[in-house]
Curated annotation (Swiss-Prot):
Complex and partners: Homodimer.
Reactions catalysed, as given in the entry: (2R,3S)-3-isopropylmalate + NAD(+) = 4-methyl-2-oxopentanoate + CO2 + NADH
Species the sequence originates in: Thiobacillus denitrificans (strain ATCC 25259 / T1)
Localisation per UniProt entry: Cytoplasm
Listed name of the protein: 3-isopropylmalate dehydrogenase
S-S bonds: none
UniProt entry tagged with the keyword ATP-binding: no
One GO cellular component term: cytosol
Length: 353
């Protein structure tokens, strides 16, 4: 199993180091793992003048899976748009044809008090958001900023093809089948033709999955319902921009964005795995970051790309044990628990494993 390791920027190298510790522990037991590291984002720009250097893309293409830290930092904000770290991330997703983004939001019982919602609203939360990743307004053409009638105008194009919607629908229905057999499709079909097509195709694909109960919700209502009664959801499927916003909102239900992993898959289940949080430049290099989302991303890698459910469960259970023992990085620390550093948390997971 060949893994391309892309630490990226900010806290990326620190959290990736902890995930690599877990992989090394599995390797010491006999797992056939090969890891190679390459720069991406700001680190890619610093090394090669490109947020996605050719050598990094080649490594990612040849690997079975990609493990990514985080990209971005204020020192890159003045670069031309195509050279900014985030563009490297968008490009690698596009180049590897990673069209389905899976973002779980679950709450560990011990962290119920860390959520910004009342414990009774969120305890037992376990939902999955499936976000389409390569279409929509982020990639639609034409786009740009130009002068019209003497003033500047910014424009983007929201666009989905039937095949793009159909393939992410099949992924979402497949995941719903393995979970609670409930799928909620989120769009804005009352005002957007793009969403109208989305909804039509979801209804068509649903015929292939008679066991799954399909419902539909407008995105504004979905945002409200996620806060009002999040446990009504099991699996959500939505487009790129709506998924970007809703999954970040859902992340705070879990107590910390530092707890949540994600997977981005192609049609053969090759994937890129990363925590959903950003590069947190304010705490970079201070050994304060929470590595659990990155470690849980490794569990997702085993679940979806390597189809090794036993190892995925082992990693997830090791994280549960560490949380149950009261170890906490600063973002999830509460009175009466033990505050640990990023590297100490990584060590604790390896011991539990």
């Amino acid at each position: 199993m060949k893994i391309a390791v892309l630490p990226g920027d900010g806290i990326g190298p620190e959290i990736i180091s902890q995930a690599v510790k877990v992989l090394e522990a599995l390797k010491s037991e006999g797992a056939k793992i090969e890891m190679e590291t390459a720069p991406i984002g700001g680190a890619g720009y610093d090394a090669a003048g490109d947020p996605l250097p050719e050598a990094t893309l080649k490594l990612a293409r040849e690997a079975d899976a990609v493990l990514l830290g985080a990209v971005g930092g204020p020192q890159y904000d003045t670069l031309d748009r195509p050279l900014r770290p985030e563009r490297g991330l968008l490009r690698i997703r596009k180049e590897l044809n990673l069209f389905a983004n899976l973002r779980p939001a679950l709450l560990y019982p011990e962290l119920a008090s860390a959520s910004s919602l009342k414990p009774e609203v969120v305890s037992g939360l376990d939902l999955m958001i499936v976000r389409e990743l390569t279409g929509d307004v982020y990639f639609g053409q034409p786009r740009g900023i130009e002068t019209r009638n003497g003033e500047r105008v910014g424009f983007n194009t929201m666009l989905y093809s039937e095949s793009e919607v159909r393939r992410v629908a099949h992924v979402a229905f497949g995941i719903a089948m393995k979970r609670g057999k409930k799928l909620c499709s989120v769009e804005k079909a009352n005002v957007l033709e793009c969403s109208e097509l989305w909804k039509e195709i979801m209804i068509e694909v649903a015929k292939d999955y008679p066991e799954v109960e399909l419902s539909h919700m407008y995105v504004d209502n979905a945002a409200m319902q996620l806060i009002r009664a999040p446990k009504q959801f099991d699996t959500i499927v939505t487009g790129n921009i709506f998924g970007d916003i809703l999954s970040d909102a859902a992340s705070m239900l879990s107590g910390s964005i530092g707890m949540l992993p994600s997977a981005s898959l192609d049609e053969h289940n090759k994937g890129m795995y990363e925590p959903i949080h950003g590069s947190a430049p304010d705490i970079a290099g201070k050994n304060l970051a929470n590595p659990l989302a990155t470690i849980l991303s490794v569990a997702m890698m085993y679940r979806y790309t390597f189809a090794d459910l036993a190892t995925a469960d082992r990693i997830e259970n090791a994280v549960k044990q560490v949380i149950a023992k009261g170890y906490r990085t600063g973002d999830i620390w509460t009175e009466g628990t033990q505050k640990v550093s990023c590297s100490e948390m990584g060590d604790a997971v390896v011991v539990a494993l």
